[in-house]
UniProtKB/Swiss-Prot annotation:
Name under which the protein is recorded: Conotoxin CnIIIG
GO molecular function: ion channel inhibitor activity; toxin activity
Tissue specificity field: Expressed by the venom duct.
Protein role: Shows a paralytic effect in fish.
Length: 73
């Protein structure tokens, strides 16, 4: 009976160690890959595409409660 207990203990200890992924198995965080994800208002219409009215002789954009207002700089 003790041999069965030892075998069961060994199996229970080794199984979780092999079932868990190790750190080197994890994919590395790649900032370049995240930058390739194009999150633009053309793809996602819920994003507010803020217009620019700044330029020579023009006013700078202002936002009030997420509404676009052209105001003075």
């Amino acid at each position: 009976m003790s041999k069965l207990g030892v075998l069961l203990t060994i199996c229970l200890l080794l199984l979780p160690l092999t079932a868990l992924p190790m750190d080197e198995d994890q994919p590395a965080d790649q900032p370049a890959d995240r930058m390739q994800d194009d999150i633009s208002s053309e793809q996602y219409p819920l994003f507010d595409k803020r217009q620019k009215c700044c330029g020579k002789g023009m006013t700078c954009p202002r936002y009030f409660r997420d509404n676009f207002i052209c105001g003075c700089c």
